[in-house]
Amino acid sequence: MKKLNTIILILLGMICTQLYAVQLNSIYPLKPNDSEAFYFTPENYPIKADGKMDVSDALQAAINQVKKEKNFGILFIPEGKYKISKTIYIPTAIRLIGYGKNRPEFILAKNSPGFQEEVADDKGKAKYMFWFTGAVVKEGEKPRDAGASTFYSAMSNINLRIEDGNPHAVALRTHFAQHSFISYVAVYIGKGKAGLFDVGNELENVAFYGGDYGIYTTKASPGWPVMMVDSYFEGQRVAALRCQESGLAMVNLYAKNVPAVFDIDPNYCDKLFLENSYFENVSGPAVVITNENNSNNQITFRNVYCKNVPTLAKYTRSNTATHVAHKIYKVKSYDHGLQMDDMVDMPEYETLVDIEPIQKMPVAQLMDIPALPAMATWVNLREFGAKGDGETDDTKAIQEAIDKYDNIYVPQGWYRITETLKMKPDTKLIGLHPFGTQFRLDESTAAFSGFGGPKAMVESSEGGANMLVGIGINTGGYNYRAVGVKWMANADSYMNDVKFVGGHGGLWKPKPGVEEPRGRWNRPARISSPDNPVAASGMDLAWDNQYWSLWVTNNGGGTFKDIWTASTYATNGFYANNTSTPGRIYAMSIEHHVRNEVRFSKVSNWKVYCMQTEEESRESTDCQPIEMDDCKDVTFANLYMFRVIRVNEPYHSSVRIRNCENIAFLNLHNYSQIKYTNNIAVFDVNKDIDIRPWELSRLIVTGKEPHQQSLGNEIGKVNQLASDLEFAEGIARDSKGNIYFCDHRMRRIFKWSVETNSLSLLADFPWKPSNLAFDSEDNLLVLFRYDAQPGYLINGKPEEMPVMPDTKGTSFSGYGNSAYTMRVYSIDPENPEETIKLLPRVPMGQVKNVYKALYPSNRWRDFHDFNAVSVYVPEMCFLAPDGKTIIPHYFDLSRSSSLLEAYPGKPFYTSDEYDRRMVKMDVANDGTLSNLSYFVEQGEFGSAVDKEGNLYIADGEIYIFDKDGKKKGMIRVPERPSTLQFGGKDGNTLFVTGRSKF
């Protein structure tokens, strides 16, 4: 009998600590040792955790102390009961984290002063237990609410309780921004008003009991989506959630014994996405929709199980409802709003419902988010000699810890590394503050500097169950090869609360005797004059010099939650390629990049919830928010794409896709406060289809949509294949007839496939490509501009730029154009990211029997030495991987529009661009040129030769001459051509790069 009682007690304990979608246990049962943190203990503060002593003033003093001394950091709260009687203010970047066998609990005492009456001048008409603010609130000051610049604030592993006599009490006010969250918090509201007012950024594993509302909220700050994973609502008197423009996406929500789950405020809209969730005993409508059939209303449910929910939705304006007769049923899908079944469908307002009756409610999913490993298994990184002082090289200590142990706790500190940290299959790196805890590179760290392929600071295992939590990744400003994290772990892996440092979101770290720099916002404006001009400020010369911040590749996947990747120094914030492993993104903010925020290439089986992009005025005027190539089976939910109020130029599109199928956009929001919202929400480049609505509840890219212009084989007909380019040039073909070209300033390399008749983005490396070519083995050769990395020394000296003797003779060599050099790298077009290799420079003449030499298509020689320099033999050439293709190294490579192939024994044509003529030369076995003769008095940038030896010249239009120089005709093209190449399966199709068109 004693044994049976024990079993019953254990079961009761489990019932008390596990409620459907959430668990109520302490996730930090042991004290995390962190020398940078503060601990709210009787040893440090005059308190008792007995639930009787009022600790309000001591708690506020402790929080303010962390802010004053550290500016960002953690106040650890040990297990116990803490009585408070007034509002506690938590300023930017301060986190309250509980620990102990049981979660600590803060209790608002009965009849606490000020909580009995509605606060008329308060936004939420209430008084709060904990209010997250933008700064420390001094005595007598009005609090400045948390907002768009309130980062890194949090409360975790703490319970809150409102005792009787506080009818206008709300436990939390959380209008904060990135890397701020509430997690593992249960709120016992009782007779109080609500658990939380004004959602922000992200919530995880939260439970609300009682109250008028669990959550009531306005628009998040500053209008971003909000992710809530694993949540429980029970016993609210009015609604589980009351909302207006909240942008909530929710996975694994359980609502029970409530009059309504979602009550949207009158005359407001919302974007609500709900998946894998449960409603039980909802006496009124599950969702109250007040502005039905408005494009701003986007209500989407997937796999929602209901018991005793007779009314799924009520539409107040029309006084209609969606009733369900079944006692227990599954909402397979519910879509309300503006919808398109495919990209060429007519947008229509619809309410689509797919419901099936079921016999019983399924067992609710306990938790959607992977659990951290047991805390007893953690080892502290500091015990391995890591200093975290920002100066000591901690690489060896960190790697030794990884090699010996799986679960590594990383206390706050800035850990300098000089080599890639490589995770084992079960490595889990756990921090608790992504700005206070950073892995950092010094400027020009040798292993990450100069030219080379992408090199990660942190590299996961391939196919492992890795975790990276609560740690910032700082690649510095100038480290050309740097990637923040390369992620190849499996579908069960987990990345959470990771900040890619750089650009916005930086905080001052106090230093003894050093004053914090003052902001520039309130300086008086200067007035420009010819004698004292005022230049626009804010441009950082280091922007866009590194690879991607977060790179998921080689079948990497898993869960990525609460990620902020806004380093303007990176090519883009998030790049996923070559993976079919399931991946889930929960709340990812990607912002402030120069060319591209997000890129997906050859990705399938991913779900993306609450992705938010933002383009800033100085850095992001030309930035493409999302780029997708060759992807399928990808779902976006609550996708927000935003341009800031300071942007003053239009941009083409927000999502640019090529060769994609079954891409679902559920709740799409393309917006800005300015008139320069991106013109098109979604654009299919190959099919020339644009989606004009900026607000959509549902859009499906099927991949079966027809081309808007059919591609025919009619001889002489010009087909536009793609647009939305800037300055397309550098055209080349491989042995199969596929065509490649580049966009120099935007640093993009494109491929046209002759098999699929479609364009794709092949590469967007930080290097600046100008011309492309192929060797005999189909290695893609990329001629690119290379600027020496500032601060990077080799053997104590800066990188040397070779002095080219042919700089004389062209005025282009002035004005800074001799401060860089041209180099060539090769890649395998099937795997460009992993195969980057710099071509060696070897003496001309080293290769006796050249397969082909590659020369500039055009030269600008305005000092009239074109004839001499064209047959001049430079000292060095670049040697391709095949060992027999060369590129003689001329200064003119820095300005040429393409590389033309010179085959020994065949005539070679090139353009004297300044004198506007084509010349003809002979090609020797060693690839050198001789016997220059004038061919035709026409020429500009590119040219091409067909199988019959006819010459095609780009010069405003395309002019055709036979091999004797006789004019045969002209091809009119819709835009000024730059470079030409024959390709296609038969090699008989002329491909043309214009400026913005292909």
Name what the model sees in each region.
Residues 561-573, 577, 583:
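Active-site-proximal segments of catalytic enzyme domains
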